[in-house]
């Protein structure tokens, strides 16, 4: 597998070593071997809300270091136009539509998430990796 887009919830599970999902997710990442993982600016935005709200500079730094391990996936205007199509056709929330559109734009082989709703709209691209 080539490039895998990581949804924000998964990056949060990794950074905060989620009690239920942290270890299974780390194992799933280790199992794919040669794959690269990518994140968008939207993922970074969603992830940083918690540490900023709590005023936790240590966790902010942990996120920043984790972000550096992933390929950055830009979100140019065509991503937003595709997201509008996805919202119109599948009723996705704006952030979910943007995640999916970004993964499609960059030709990702998969979009890993913990959200079953994305799987229906993605025609097999998105999958709940923790299900």
Predicted feature residues:
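Acidic, PIN/NYN-like endoribonuclease modules and their adjacent C-terminal/linker elements
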Residues: 1-3, 27, 69, 100-131
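Acidic catalytic patch
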Residues: 17, 69-89
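Active-site charged/polar residues at nucleotide-handling catalytic sites that mediate phosphoryl
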Residues: 32, 90, 106
């Amino acid at each position: 597998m080539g490039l895998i887009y990581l949804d924000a919830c998964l990056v949060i599970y990794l950074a905060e070593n989620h009690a239920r999902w942290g270890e299974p997710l780390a194992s799933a990442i280790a199992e794919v071997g040669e794959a690269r993982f990518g994140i968008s600016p939207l993922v970074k935005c969603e992830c940083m809300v918690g540490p900023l709200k709590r005023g936790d500079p240590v966790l902010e730094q942990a996120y920043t270091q984790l972000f550096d391990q992933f390929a950055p996936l830009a979100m140019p205007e065509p991503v937003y136009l595709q997201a509008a199509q996805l919202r119109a056709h599948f009723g996705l929330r704006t952030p979910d539509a943007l995640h999916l559109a970004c993964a499609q734009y960059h030709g990702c082989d998969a979009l890993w998430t913990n959200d079953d709703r994305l799987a229906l709209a993605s025609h097999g691209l998105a999958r709940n990796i923790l299900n």
